[in-house]
From Swiss-Prot:
It comes from Borrelia hermsii. This is Variable large protein 15/16. It comes from the Bacteria. A lipid is attached at residue 19 (S-diacylglycerol cysteine). Genes for both Vlp and Vsp families are on (usually) unnamed linear plasmids in B.hermsii HS1. It is a lipid-anchor. Its main location: membrane. A lipid is attached at residue 19 (N-palmitoyl cysteine). Belongs to the variable large protein (Vlp) family. Delta subfamily. Residues 333-354 are annotated as: Disordered. Residues 338-354 have a biased composition (Polar residues). InterPro entries: Borrelia_lipo. It is found in: Cell outer membrane. Pfam families: Lipoprotein_2.
Length: 354
């Protein structure tokens, strides 16, 4: 896309040079071409700014803090707001062409504003200085804060609605066996005999690897709001209730058929890892089991967020391409009435002074 815009700018620049040769005074056509060239450059700058943000490395590791995830969402919100302001400024500075103005306004309202709002909401749910992979042998699992889980589900859901099409991702996607899926409940158990070992962590990784990031995002978006975190893992019915499942003696399996889906399990692990207070458990006196569980948590979060940012980037790229296409079709006579009237008023005022 950057090459396409650059080509347009270069072509316009060459036209401008030819129009200005010989010291001829600027005519309306030259002013028009200059305005369009400036507008095109402004949109290119917007694209570069956004590209710099999304190509930056964001390596999710087991020791990544929950607050780092919150900052990630806050940065998405700030970037959308920045792109919005730059687009608005370029339209105002370089000529109010109705075609471009309409496309920009639609893009801002239907894409940028909605992504920004979703990211702002999601950031409320990812707080705390503890790590996303925070299972420690000899320590119990802890249910994620219900309000935080709801904020993540709502915010991510709002973004998903904009950046993923109907056919992208399946909230019910599943491939692994029932026995393996049921055993993942041990990541949320209480008694030591019920706590996760490497086998259960491996099963969790299998569920995460069996589905796409889009599947996980759709499972998060499909989750209902939870009232509290007082239900155990065997009562969990969706990703949100898996994330908020409390640890209870002898409750160690994911049993509900709706929850026993790879996409839902992966989404629940990702939400619990990101949400305030959420913690997994591992076999007592087995550090290797804790490391395996934490690796699974990091994998779920990484897959979820990398897919989300790629989807956001593609959606914004598509919107900027639409603006670029509108820019390529505008003609001098397309300039909006308000811009024309402003120019005429300025000319009349100067003549009156003379």
């Amino acid at each position: 896309m950057r090459k396409r815009i650059s080509a347009i700018i270069m072509t316009l620049f060459m036209v401008l040079v030819s129009c200005n040769s010989g010291g001829v005074a600027e005519d309306p056509k030259t002013v028009y071409l200059t305005s369009i060239a400036n507008l095109g450059k402004g949109f290119l700058d917007v694209f570069v700014t956004f590209g710099d943000m999304v190509t930056g490395a964001f390596g999710i590791k087991a020791d990544t803090k929950k607050s780092d995830i919150g900052k990630y969402f806050t940065d998405i919100e700030k970037t959308m707001t920045s792109v919005k302001k730059k687009l608005q400024d370029e339209v105002v500075k370089n000529g109010n062409y109705a075609k471009v103005k309409t496309v920009v306004a639609k893009f801002i309202e239907e894409v940028l504003d909605k992504i920004a709002a979703g990211a702002k909401e999601a950031a409320k749910g990812a707080t705390g200085s503890d790590a996303i992979g925070n299972a420690v042998h000899n320590q119990d699992a802890v249910a994620a804060d219900a309000t935080s889980v709801n904020a993540l589900v709502k915010g991510i859901g709002e973004i998903v609605e904009v950046v993923l099409k109907d056919g992208e991702g399946d909230a019910g996607a599943t491939k692994t066996g029932d026995t393996e899926k049921k055993s993942i409940g041990k990541l949320f158990a209480k008694k030591d005999d019920d706590r996760a070992q490497e086998a259960e962590a491996s099963a969790a990784n299998a569920s995460i690897g069996a589905v796409s990031g889009a599947d996980i995002l759709k499972a998060i978006a499909k989750s209902g709001e939870i009232a509290d975190n007082n239900k155990n893992i065997e009562e969990a019915k969706d990703a949100a209730s898996i994330a908020a499942a409390k640890q209870t003696d002898d409750k160690k399996e994911i049993k509900d058929e709706a929850a026993k889906k790879d996409a839902v399990i992966a989404a629940g692990i990702a939400l619990r890892a990101m949400a305030k207070g959420g913690k997994f458990t591992a076999k007592q006196n087995e550090e290797k089991s804790a490391n395996a569980v934490n690796g699974a948590a990091a994998s779920a979060v990484g897959k979820t967020l990398s897919t989300l940012i790629i989807a956001i980037r593609n959606t914004v790229d598509s919107g900027l391409k639409t603006i670029n296409e509108a820019l390529a079709t505008v003609k001098q006579e397309d300039k909006s009435v308000e811009a024309t009237n402003t120019a005429e008023a300025t000319t009349s005022g100067q003549q009156a002074k003379n």
